[in-house]
Amino acid sequence: PARRFFHILETQGAEPRLFSTPKQPVSDADHAIGIHVASLVRDGGTLQIGIGSLGDAVTAALVMRHEAPDVFAETLRRLCHGEIPQGRETQPFETGLYAASEMFVDGFMELYRHGILKRKAGDGAVLHAGFFLGTEAFYSFLRELPDKERDLFSMRGISFVNELFGEEAQKRADRADARFVNTAMMATLLGETI
């Protein structure tokens, strides 16, 4: 809302285009990882995904699980050589997911559009993030959201997203059954990712 700003410049030509990211192709390996990850995400849980092909693959797999659970389960079964491991999830999302992520990316938009990103935190937000980065379509989605829906996406300081301090009890409750999905450049012998 305009009341949150000191100055607003409204004139043609004063609206530079936001930097948008290209969509990278999603490999077969990314899709396979995405299916496995989606089976580990609990209904009513919390999700963090990053930008790039792996985040896109996880998003696609979660949508498949929600909208075509039989196809999802069969795909997972085949990836697991005939038997789905115990404890894996294959059912649609009833309660839905909440997201806590430094970066608000296209994948969260898709999960919201498909009725998956819908579990509200204590403050009513379905997502807390520190910044956003995405495609032109993602930016259009954000611009065109009605105010009431826009309020579901709460942009906060990075420290709010990354730390429990300050509102620890509420953040722990909000971030139940969290799954954090990222890629790394390398892993050390002790398991640290860089």
Question: Residue spans of the language-model regions?
Answer:
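Conserved alpha/beta enzyme-core scaffold
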Residues: 1-194
